[in-house]
């Protein structure tokens, strides 16, 4: 299939900047499919004051590019373990049109979520089969719905522990509230050098791949802050016409070569690593002078225009979700 373009169905989302920020690499899990550098506590948590300065600089730059709304996705490690996490969220929420989404394993006690969930627009749970207590996740997600906060669970599907993963899915489906979503997520092999060529999909069978074709349970958004400007549903333009585009479908079908495409990585999405270094997109490794690889507490320049992709493989779901055109 020849794809000419992928873009958001709702044009308002083109005026939204998505910031993925790894606050540190401290985690209370030690998953077999996760690189040690992502959970071994080898980098300190971010400095709160430096981060506030960066946040101000970011708003000033991107507002001049026509960005009106900002989605902050905080990961780790486990971001909720950061001692200043709540204060960081409060500072961001003091500015208009900011939406915070922790990417979390959900292991914090229920009372923590009951107290602090008011700071979040939504919560994305990474469900790790080797450590998760699925009944606890159900209790947390049900409570978030009662607080009118959207959530979705991404279940990491290990092909060699498939039955355990399916058992977890069944526990999640048996929740009191059905508005929060459940999505099976394909895993990629741990890579040594962080090059796109090494990010190969786990060896799923054709039957196993079927679970990635559609959400297990679609998310029914209930947050009063939700509107079309925050809907990132996508379409693609092909030789056969206009069709819906699902990034999970693209990755599982090895539609990962976007080289030569104009891509909005850096304009629509940026990533900040646990070492404070910034990148375009999320896992994107396209170079951009005076931005890519720079630390956010040093001198740098934010991107000002789309880039031309020169990578042969783009397998990070978040990067695939960035608009692209030939």
Indicate where each model-derived feature is located.
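Flexible mid-to-C-terminal extensions adjoining Fe-S/redox cofactors in radical SAM and related proteins
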Residues: 1-17, 37, 41, 269, ...
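Short, hydrophobic/glycine-enriched beta-strand segments
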Residues: 17-23, 73-74
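C-terminal accessory regions of radical SAM enzymes
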Residues: 224-288
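N-terminal active-site segment of His-dependent metallophosphoesterases
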Residues: 34-59
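Radical SAM/AdoMet-radical enzyme domain recognition
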Residues: 52-73, 82-175, 179-183
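Acidic metal-phosphate-binding loop of nucleotide-sugar-dependent transferases
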Residues: 78-79
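Conserved C-terminal portion of the radical SAM core fold
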Residues: 132-248
